[in-house]
Swiss-Prot record:
GO MF annotation, one: RNA binding
Taxonomic path: Bacteria, Bacillati, Bacillota, Bacilli, Bacillales
Keyword Transmembrane helix: no
Function in brief: Regulates expression of the glpD operon. In the presence of glycerol 3-phosphate (G3P) causes antitermination of transcription of glpD at the inverted repeat of the leader region to enhance its transcription. Binds and stabilizes glpD leader mRNA. May also regulate expression of the glpFK operon.
Superkingdom of this protein's organism: Bacteria
Alphabetized UniProt keyword annotations: Glycerol metabolism, RNA-binding, Transcription, Transcription regulation
Recorded name of the encoding gene: glpP
Covalent S-S links between cysteines: none
Protein name: Glycerol uptake operon antiterminator regulatory protein
Amino acid sequence: MMSFHNQPILPAIRNMKQFDEFLNSSFSYGVILDIHLGQLKGVIKEAQKHGKNMMVHVDLIQGIKHDEYGAEFICQDIKPAGIISTRSNVIAKAKQKKIYAIQRLFLLDTSAMEKSMEFIGKHKPDFIEVLPGIVPSLIQEIKEKTGIPIFAGGFIRTEEDVEQALKAGAVAVTTSNTKLWKKYENFLTESD
């Protein structure tokens, strides 16, 4: 089973308490979700001091426009390891700036999936984050159709949810559930 930098879990950080937990963990990659632009650079620098690599969910940053210009600023000035977005122009900018480009894909219905597949074919993100991440058959289908590594996220509540997503072909699962972080952090330290 393939994983993302030997991490089956990508901690998704929603607040400073979770950020502190992440800094004190053995994970090397995490995702910043809700944050204000004024805090972002300091959070990224603090993570880097601890040897951590942060991916930023651009669509959830307050205080910046969620377009290619905002993405360019984040890539050049903030310098995260990667950018997550539902917007294909933001993904294109991340690819141009040579950081991880993660296309977030909400699976609402067949037509939404088909439209997303067109964008993905055009922009070729490095990863696709599939939401909700609890539908193994869709994870498998998107992986087969695109050949692009998949992150599964959304409604990941139990170990079983994580395992099913990984078995379906996801390289990692994004979750803000700190109990799952701890469980899979133990997995990380056992496999060293």
